[in-house]
């Protein structure tokens, strides 16, 4: 038997501490109230749609509520919210030497007409990548000590916007917000997929005294002690100096071998390492660029570990698109959409913080979720998400059930408008 009144009270208390003492600390009352309303609405509705969020605020006129939330999304400056959010992550959840994962995704709006900067992009989720109306999105996430995903940047942009230069420029804007929050004396490892192996990213990370690991394209030509060769030619000379095992995202243990060679490239200022990895029983050779010292086995494994969990950002994209209706927003301005995603990141991180720091409440959320489970559903989740992704899914649905029993949203300390006329 569940005492939902007690559970709702505990969640309200935890959420108030999370937002008022951390995310909205020392911020104006109007911003604090707005962020509180948005995060509460996202958690209790399980959606990023303004209409669903508005219904969970229990106000008299839903249309007025929707207009207020939409107007605030388009007009308020949430940069200080983002700063407080980064400080909270750095102090409470992230590793001291953080693993930062970067990738691009897209938001498809095939029936959209009035969105600011709506452009034509390739829909990567469909076979053949057909051209559709939508927006490109830059995503940057990091991991906790237990490898739970924590969103850092979800930036939607348009090539049609004034001042837009390139995808690389948008990515660097995000990195410029992340790097200063890495504590002095510690070093982040920034993991990029193929397509990011240009000088722009490697030299930026290197200049900031951080580490990078980038999946290399096969067509690149590098200079080694044996001359100029492409990736496949270099890989053919190395059969694997170091042997090791690791667990894939499906949980299976795999045997692999890896070697490392120092190379140079005409576009790069400094030499760097190529790590060549061969997976046993897979006809696949993977090559990574890195500025981590790979002269020893420890360095090679460090570089491979830095990249190994890069697929977690793809899992995060899948989670927000399917569980929070990421592609169904109805906000027209780019600023409003990005402010919506700031609030969504804050809400998702609240779930992660409960899993990581409040074991008693996390156990109660799991107990609430259990009656919903069945074998087929759990097997489906195991195909979609890893162990950590499944836990985040359970936290999201358990939290939605608990807050569904709330009769009103938490009150922000301060002036009560209803008492003004009494």
Per-range role (PLM):
Residues 161-228:
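Domain-level cores of phosphate- or acyl-group-handling catalytic modules
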Residues 335-347:
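Small-residue-rich helix-loop
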Residues 124-185, 275-286, 291:
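Electropositive, glycine- and tryptophan-enriched low-complexity nucleic-acid-binding patches
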Residues 283-310:
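Extended, non-catalytic structural segments that build the interaction scaffolds
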Residues 1-36, 40-42, 46-66, 71-73, ...:
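A short, flexible helix-boundary coil/loop motif
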